[in-house]
């Protein structure tokens, strides 16, 4: 039932994007001392939504639904200043990005919970 609501699909896509972004950030932190490693990040969720191929809609039951933007399309290089060993991972920057991704994920979950509560209340189920 919830997957038919645009708001919940958007919240699910935001949660998936945030999870993918956290995985990229974790990979950056894990390679902070690897010589020659270049830090990467995900493109902004809003930018991924603005892509024309993401706006596909299912108009008939036989159509396959898209789960949202493809996280692999959003990878970009985004490091800090280059160190002598060719590594550009800034741990401070990665921690800041991790906090942003966590906040986005929490916002997506809050939207999903609020939508669920509204639907339950409208159906007369207060639990």
Regions found by a protein language model. Give the residues of each.
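Amphipathic alpha-helical polymerization modules
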Residues: 1-127
């Amino acid at each position: 039932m919830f997957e038919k609501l645009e708001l919940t699909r958007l919240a699910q896509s935001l949660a998936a994007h945030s999870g993918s972004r956290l995985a990229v950030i974790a990979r950056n932190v894990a390679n902070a001392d690897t010589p020659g490693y270049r830090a990467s990040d995900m493109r902004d969720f809003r930018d991924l939504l603005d892509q024309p191929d993401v706006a596909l809609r299912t108009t008939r039951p036989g159509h396959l639904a898209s789960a949202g933007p493809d996280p692999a399309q959003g990878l970009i290089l985004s490091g800090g200043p280059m160190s002598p060993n060719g590594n550009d991972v800034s741990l401070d920057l990665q921690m800041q990005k991790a906090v942003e991704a966590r906040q986005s994920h929490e916002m997506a979950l809050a939207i999903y919970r609020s939508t669920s509560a509204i639907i339950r209340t409208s159906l007369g189920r207060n639990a």
